[in-house]
Amino acid sequence: MIARAISKAGITASPYHAGLKKADRATVQEGWSSGKIQVAVATVAFGMGIDRHCVRYVVHWSLPKTIEGFYQEAGRAGRDGLPSHSLVFYSPEDVGKYKYLIRMQGNKSGKGAEAERMAEKNIERKLEQLELMQDYCTQLKCRRNTLIKHFGGKSVNCQKTCDYCRNPKKVERSLHASSAIKDVRRQQNMFGKNGSRKSKGKQAWNGQWDKPHGDDE
């Protein structure tokens, strides 16, 4: 779907995922590596296998689950030293969905007190990592220095290489607009567009899976 939409805009794009035949995946990878395909719409696994230095953009269609993962994936852009961009399409609903999946997967661990203790500890760790990534996307401060400090480095002059340092007012407006949209959707989930109250089950479902997207670099 995403690759098709990009292609309609006049940019050559192809999907790359496990559902494709091996020969088709090889064709896409070869085409993208040679430059015939401008955009590969792919899974994280494909992205981490990239060894092409002239990547100009890495776009995350949804929120990465950890800062470490985001840093590795975004780092695939600009390995030739030239200016490049990392873009994240962030939605609060992504966070709700991931929290749900983390807890569901954690609850599938083995039985017994020790297994349950380890599962709970693992769930807490993953939720903390997710919260750090969410904070990165919603903060009102330099994103470059946030990453540097996360990995134990010292602050640097960003030189307007992140969206916040380039235009802090724009980032603030975007976050406020996203919050307002979320409030409107919450009201729609509770009462419906015609003003009638929905069932609690419907509210919970819509709250987890509706997905309006904002963006952060």
Language-model features: where?
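Generic alpha-helical segment signature
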Residues: 63, 91, 123-126, 140
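A general structural signal marking secondary-structure boundaries and capping sites
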Residues: 36, 137-140, 169
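A short, ordered amphipathic alpha-helix with a cationic face
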Residues: 87-89, 120-123, 133-136
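Soluble or luminal CAZymes and related metallo-dependent hydrolases
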Residues: 24, 122-125, 129
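Intrinsically disordered, low-complexity sequence elements enriched in Ser/Thr/Gly/Pro
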Residues: 23, 74, 142, 183-184, ...
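C-terminal accessory regions
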Residues: 126-158, 162-164
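Accessory DNA-binding and partner-docking regions appended to nucleic-acid-acting proteins
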Residues: 96, 102, 108-118, 126-127, ...
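Helicase motor core with emphasis on the C-terminal RecA-like subdomain
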Residues: 1-111, 117, 155
